[in-house]
């Protein structure tokens, strides 16, 4: 792909669906078989989006750097949070619910940082697709729709996490009311 050549990043085919991602520590783009071998506008848009992340990395886009630094921490903390939540529900321990609330709040904040990263990568993808003449007129509109739909998944995930956070707060408040 021409976009790859511009960013001097290696691209590999990997197994799975919806597993496409840019790995900033290894400076490589992993694309699922359908995207890697695809010729559809959707395949081009997804591949270009991942190239957008590589460009963010190369240009030191601040939200990308923050997000990349937070990924390992959030992954570990999220695991602990759900484990703590399970213990609190089974054992009725409100201390673990409070811990889970704090951890879920950290997850929500991480998702807030992720949104501008994903939106910016999609914008960069569209610029690359246009500059390299990989899409024309209606194809450009289709690529925008694909990338907008992808962004909506991040928004939906954020809203879901916010609702989970509110649910935990309500559980904690109801347990505190029961103790009064």
Cite the ranges covered by each PLM segment:
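Short, small-residue-biased leader/transition segments that mark boundaries at the very start
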Residues: 1-3
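A composition-biased, non-transmembrane "mature-region" signal
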Residues: 5-16
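Catalytic zinc-binding patch centered on the HExxH motif and its immediate surroundings
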Residues: 14-28
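Short pre-active-site segment immediately N-terminal to the catalytic Zn-binding motif
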Residues: 30-45
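Active-site recognition of the HExxH zinc-binding catalytic motif
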Residues: 45-60
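Short juxtamembrane and helix-loop transition motifs at transmembrane-helix boundaries
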Residues: 58-68
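Metalloprotease/metallohydrolase-associated module, dominated by Zn2+-dependent proteases
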Residues: 70-156, 161
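Juxtamembrane boundary at the C-terminal end of a transmembrane helix
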Residues: 165-180
């Amino acid at each position: 792909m021409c976009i790859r050549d511009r960013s001097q990043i290696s691209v590999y085919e990997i197994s799975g669906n919806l597993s496409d991602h840019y790995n900033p520590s290894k400076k490589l783009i992993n694309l699922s078989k359908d995207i890697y071998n695809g010729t559809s506008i959707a395949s081009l848009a997804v591949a270009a989006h991942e190239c957008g992340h590589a460009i963010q990395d190369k240009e030191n886009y601040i939200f990308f750097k923050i997000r990349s630094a937070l990924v390992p921490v959030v992954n570990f903390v999220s695991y602990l949070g759900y484990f703590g939540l399970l213990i609190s529900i089974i054992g009725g321990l409100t201390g673990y619910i409070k811990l889970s609330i704090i951890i879920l709040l950290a997850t929500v904040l991480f998702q807030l940082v992720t949104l501008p990263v994903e939106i910016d990568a999609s914008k960069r993808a569209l610029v690359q697709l246009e500059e390299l003449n990989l899409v024309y007129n209606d194809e450009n509109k289709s690529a925008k729709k694909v990338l907008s739909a992808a962004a909506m998944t991040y928004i939906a995930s954020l809203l879901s996490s916010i609702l989970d956070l509110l649910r935990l707060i309500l559980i904690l408040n109801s347990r505190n009311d029961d103790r009064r």
